[in-house]
């Protein structure tokens, strides 16, 4: 196995290669715009004109180099890596449990900052700091607080709004703990929510619960769980406000396959860890969401996040 390391950003990984399948580490310019280094190494391995499998994230430039310079037949083989990552062993499950515990603790510790007048960006910075305090190396993705209300800005993306009375604060964050990701979500209401907001919260909880409970009934696929959760929203008349898939597997990457999504026919097997994250989004009104990491077990499931899902209201 030849390991290509970006010279500027990747040299710190060298100590971790001992005892692995890697037989040679090659330093490359970051970025290697010409591809000269890795094309040379691939030729030395005798891969000119051969069949080369790549993952789905490879750049179009790299594919063209393999085809035109190396004269290789290139096919996408991500399913091989996906299948190896999908089912976690006991050590990996232990790390996922610990990381979910950390996410719960971060949520608990960030709550005192949720008050009118606080800037959202300050909260996001503090969440990142808390993850590091609890042993995470970095965020598992660019998490955010989705703050929606009458005068709020964009639904997603960098959010610099202040928290105000009558707004919802929907968390979506995670940390990287010993190479494994967490992904977490809860919603906080700033001031007493009206009946409509309470109903939205109840629907989100029901959509998640119904999907999880289906895991106890026998074999399930990502599409089956997605259909159950979306069905709850459709029946309640808020289907168009559930604007995304129900979830995704998670582990080394925050978004792994199989997805909990339409068209996903892969069976969810014991040892797989995945998110279940229904939401209701109403622009200029609210984002109500919940997200937990779930472990598929022989008898159903284990929810790795243990912190309360009860409705949370802060004084305004």
Predicted regions mapped to residue ranges:
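Active-site neighborhoods and metal-handling regions in enzymes and metal-associated proteins
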Residues: 1-316
């Amino acid at each position: 196995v030849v390991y290509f390391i970006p010279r500027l950003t990747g040299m710190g990984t060298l100590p971790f290669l001992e005892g692995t399948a890697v037989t040679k580490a090659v330093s490359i310019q970051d970025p290697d715009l010409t591809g000269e280094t890795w094309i040379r190494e691939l030729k030395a391995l005798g891969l000119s004109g051969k069949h080369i499998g790549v993952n789905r994230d490879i750049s179009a430039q790299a594919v063209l180099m393999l085809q035109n310079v190396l004269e290789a037949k290139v096919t996408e083989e991500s399913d091989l890596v996906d299948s190896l990552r999908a089912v976690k062993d006991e050590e990996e499950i232990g790390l996922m449990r610990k990381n979910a515990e950390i996410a719960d603790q971060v949520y608990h510790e960030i709550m005192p900052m949720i008050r009118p007048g606080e800037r959202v960006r300050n909260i996001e910075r503090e969440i990142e700091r808390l993850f590091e305090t609890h042993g995470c190396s970095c965020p598992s993705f660019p998490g955010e607080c989705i703050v929606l209300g009458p005068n709020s800005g964009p639904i997603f993306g960098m959010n610099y709004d202040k928290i105000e009375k009558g707004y919802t604060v929907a968390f979506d964050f995670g940390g990287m703990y010993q190479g494994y990701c967490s992904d977490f979500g809860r919603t906080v209401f700033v001031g007493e929510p009206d009946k409509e907001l309470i109903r939205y919260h109840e629907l989100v909880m029901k959509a998640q619960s119904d999907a999880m409970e289906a895991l106890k009934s026998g074999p399930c696929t990502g599409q089956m769980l997605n259909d159950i959760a979306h069905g709850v929203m459709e029946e309640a008349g808020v289907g168009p406000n559930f604007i995304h898939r129900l979830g995704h597997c998670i582990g080394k990457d925050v978004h792994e396959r199989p997805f909990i999504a339409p068209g996903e026919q892969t069976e969810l097997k014991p040892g797989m860890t995945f998110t279940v994250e229904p939401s209701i989004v109403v622009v200029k009104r609210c984002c109500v969401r919940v997200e937990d990491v779930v472990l598929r077990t022989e008898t159903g499931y284990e929810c790795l996040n243990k912190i309360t899902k009860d409705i949370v209201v802060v004084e305004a």
